Amino acid sequence: VRSPTDAWTTCALGHRHWGLAGAAGLLLHRVGAAGVEVLLQLRVEWSHHGGTWGTPGGALHPAEAAADGALREAGEELGLQRSDVVLGVESVDDHGGWSYTTVLATPAAELEPADLALNEESVGVGWFPLDALPELHPGFAASLPVLRPLLG
């Protein structure tokens, strides 16, 4: 669904970002056999930073709370429902005039990639141990030092 905030903007740091009202993503995490694992989505090639892994997320709609936007995007991109997750803390990466909010969450029940319904923006999804991450979206990679301590 197109929103009036679906457009490119430039932040105070001179970076180009999608979402006039900012953006948000859902970072699902769990404890696996090798420690903390995160659920990442492989972005389709035609998308911004396509071919990299990151959180399901996107532009916020007008006056939309970050958690609501992250859940909406995770629903569109992976088929997740609000009842599938337990929301945790939020981490804001503020660039001046534009920000990305990462909403941390845990699965409400067992959740595997085969349980998800990917849309055209996603070409893959998987759980990854924090010490064995694939090629990451550069914005997500830059935020990892702040996010890691929040993951337990």
Question: How should these model regions be labeled?
Answer:
Residues 47-51:
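A conserved beta-turn-beta hairpin within the catalytic core of GNAT-like acetyltransferases
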Residues 1-27, 31-33:
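Acidic, metal-coordinating catalytic segment for phosphate/diphosphate chemistry
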Residues 37-38:
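Entry beta-strands of beta-propeller and related beta-repeat scaffolds
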Residues 25-28, 53-61:
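Short, flexible micro-motifs
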Residues 31-33, 44-46, 92-95:
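Short polar/acidic secondary-structure junctions
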